[in-house]
Amino acid sequence: MKGAIRKNLLTERIDIVKPLGWYRDSPTLTDVDVKYLLLYFEENYGLTVEKKIIDAVAVIANENRYHPVCDFLNALQWDGTERIRFCLHRFLGSDTDDYTYEALKLFLLGAISRAFKPGCKFEVMLCLVGGQGAGKSSFFRLLAVNDDWFSDDLKKLDDENVYRKMQGHWIIEMSEMIATANAKSIEEIKSFLSRQKETYKIPYETHPADRKRQCVFGGSSNTLDFLPLDRTGNRRFVPVMVYPERAEVHILEDEQASREYINQMWAEAQASREYINQMWAEAMEIYRSGNFRLRFSPAMNAYLKAHQKDFMPEDTKAGQILDYLERYSGSIVCSKQLYKEALGHDYDEPKQWELREINDIMNNAVTGWRAFSNPRYFPEPYRRQKGWERIRNDNEPDNSMDGFQEIPTEEMEQLGLPEEWLKQK
């Protein structure tokens, strides 16, 4: 009995980790196990008070607690061969560039950090994008090392059991959840990813408790433009394209049922496990060094923002405005001007939401222009407006008066402009 009863810090349940003389098919303590334990203590020690025995089991388990993921990671020894850079190419045919390397490395370090420091800040979702049958879900399952540490059962966030479905899992796949989400649910997903803990009560507990997150989330999509159109950026979602025809090892082939290949299937599966284990060992080496951050560098963030556009619907209005600005010779513009001249609403007045959309495009999708907050005078019919000014290179001539027209003296007097301005005119 010594050392057999332990609390599993990943599942927050009691495990029996040694054979105790009766049939068991899972380490987790069950009602049948409790009956056997009661019988054991009665026959060997004459103890018959059920509550005291169960309380003693809980205390012993807590004194002998363990974390299976941390134990697995601590036991790894890296052999020095770099695998993180090539892993997604090996199994899914992805590129081996710096972006793909940084994306997977960040995801692995986030998973390690969540195991050793539950509740640490990590809100990034690695999203694998490619056709059906590419092996995206199988990759996340393989990455979790132990199938019990993986789950793809999280289908919707308004499920009352959503937190219970996270319990005991290290890597959770959210398949197609982003692709089928609307604007409101996307914000819910972002908020969900940003949380560091949940407060809830598991069965048989009297009081709810804070449960710090020990898991990370992976996403998969068969649809290329799965990201919502968000000009401010979708920094939580890190997409990586997969090309299964370029993969060196196709995960799904290891699971074919043909008997003549079953031995080879298991050999390949074991080789894949060894590869994944060594990749985790490489990530642990980085983690132990302490020389990492759970976020991208500014340069990689800039690349991510540009890269994400390949996974968003076409932004036609931004395209119209960019085309207009390329042909426009003036040095300042305002939102009403862009509404009428760039978007072609010659006779309409813009609604507030349309002006906000133009502001969003200019502030997040356009380069070479910066906003100014003090209103300036524009040609008729725009008059006095806030807007944007062109950012000039040092070698460019100053055309800052472009787009202005002379205001008559009578109109300047009506506007109440300073008298010295009138004299200058």
Residue spans for each PLM region:
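N-terminal nucleic-acid engagement/recognition segments and initiation subdomains in replication
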Residues: 1-83, 98, 102, 348-349, ...
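Structural recognition of the conserved hydrophobic beta-strand(s) that form the central parallel beta-sheet
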Residues: 173-174, 214-222, 239
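P-loop NTPase catalytic core of nucleic-acid-dependent motor ATPases
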Residues: 57-167, 336, 343
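AAA+/SF3 P-loop NTPase mechanochemical coupling elements
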Residues: 162-167, 202-220
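Conserved AAA+/SF3 P-loop NTPase catalytic/coupling segment centered on the Walker-B
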Residues: 171-193, 227-233
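Conserved catalytic/switch belt of AAA+ P-loop NTPases
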Residues: 186-209
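Conserved alpha/beta core segments of nucleic-acid transaction machinery
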Residues: 286-330
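A short helix-turn-beta junction within AAA+ P-loop NTPase domains corresponding to the substrate/partner-engaging
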Residues: 229-247
